[in-house]
């Protein structure tokens, strides 16, 4: 099955502490988890690694977020939107369900 949310898609958070925030998908970990730029930031205590010249300390980084807690952002409507699939010229493409616009 094709993925409804892919890398570099602009998404909006539907639930949780970052509700309403928008960001770009950096990485799709599995069918159910993604990493979004600037969303779900957590503090990680990191040990120094002298061999790699990395300092230790508390580092803020993005954690994975469930796909069910985000939705694709439709720039035409300015809202979160659902995604569907259809065939155009023999290829399977994604489209927004609210206005039937094809997602590039």
Swiss-Prot record:
Domain of life according to the entry: Bacteria
Annotated GO MF terms: rRNA binding; structural constituent of ribosome
Sorted UniProt keywords: Ribonucleoprotein, Ribosomal protein, RNA-binding, rRNA-binding
Example of a GO cellular component annotation carried by this entry: ribonucleoprotein complex
Family matches, as Pfam families: KOW, ribosomal_L24
InterPro entries associated with the record: KOW, Rib_uL2_dom2, Ribosomal_uL24, Ribosomal_uL24_CS, Ribosomal_uL24_KOW, Translation_prot_SH3-like_sf
GO biological process entries: translation
Family: Belongs to the universal ribosomal protein uL24 family.
Stated role: One of two assembly initiator proteins, it binds directly to the 5'-end of the 23S rRNA, where it nucleates assembly of the 50S subunit. One of the proteins that surrounds the polypeptide exit tunnel on the outside of the subunit.
Subunit structure: Part of the 50S ribosomal subunit.
Protein name per UniProt: Large ribosomal subunit protein uL24
Native organism taxonomy: Bacteria, Pseudomonadati, Pseudomonadota, Gammaproteobacteria, Enterobacterales
